[in-house]
């Protein structure tokens, strides 16, 4: 890690500590899950959630009647310096260890895009990162206090934090793209009863970017399967293409953020 990246993370941690004072000291490193993709981890954690969720981890705001974010009202605003500031606070329930993971996730956006997550002062619209009962977020800016949930027992990983924050910037799951049927096959008979609605296509702005099998926002092959190991999503024409990952934002994920916000 170079000096600038290290400094960035230290500054982020300082901001997090100002948002809510640290109450305990723990080791700074947390490992990502080694055997499952991010979506599988999220869905497993969210099984016990009392929140009404769409596509596994998306909250439908009360001021919208569908998962639609078509106009600029649900995007975060760019300032005079062409920087998109997203005010946020972090719950005091998170440990210093948790906050370092969140800071790491935020630093990826700062290093690769014009998005800047800034500690909230008096801004009316802001993200509140909280230890709720699951991993979830709304799509885009909803107005006022906007909860991004990262449950301490299953969601505090850099990749999951990036995934949920990317939802908050306005991005859907990759397999929800309007043109997805050209790239994946949905195996409807393998989907758990009552879960098919999670595979509906959305009216998306694909920004003239290619379908990204490697997107951080893509379901894994067995999402919502009726039994373990059954594929609910199969890449086409090459069924062996890997989908679902845990590392973090892909190059195309980053490209789309920059295109959407005119970075």
From Swiss-Prot:
SUPFAM superfamilies: Metalloproteases ('zincins'), catalytic domain (SSF55486). Residues 20-64 form a propeptide. Its EC number is 3.4.24.67. The active site is at residue 164. GO terms for molecular function: metalloendopeptidase activity; metallopeptidase activity; zinc ion binding. Pfam families: Astacin. Metalloendopeptidase which participates in the breakdown of the egg envelope at the time of hatching. Cleaves the N-terminal regions of the zona pellucia glycoproteins ZP2 and ZP3, where it specifically recognizes the peptide sequences TVQQS-|-DYLIK (major site) and KLMLK-|-APEPF (minor site). This is Hatching enzyme 1.2.
